[in-house]
Amino acid sequence: MRTAASTRSIIRTVAAVATAGLLSSCMLFARPPKDVDYSRARTSEGGLYRAAIRPQGDSIPRGRLQRWTLHLETAQGAPVDNAAVAVDGGMPQHGHGLPTKPRVTRALGNGDHLVEGIKFNMGGWWVVKFRVRAAAGTDSLLFNVRL
């Protein structure tokens, strides 16, 4: 036999789960902020580097592993070849990361770095973050991608 306290506890739990589900579904269909910058070139957060991303083709495909070129230069325009670069990212509105673990696999020279293992498994607003450590210092770049 259920007591009034256990019935209230069940009702609270069901209400909390329903509210969480409703909020999650609202996030899935929410639009990105209007001021999102989708450009493929930018200055790092601390101003130490300028960078550009170049996907393999004209468009960024969904559901396929990709290779990108990350071009890095100092704020003064000198190519950055000897950099340690960490790659991360995800979907801000969905609260999850990338489905793969992309990484910079080698320096190509003249400031270019090969990024392998990038994959986007659904349409929407994604961010790709690069944390760069080189002679000029450590700094971060964030690129917005829309599929």
Language model feature labels by segment:
Residues 25-147:
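Intrinsically disordered, low-complexity terminal tails/loops enriched in metal-binding residues
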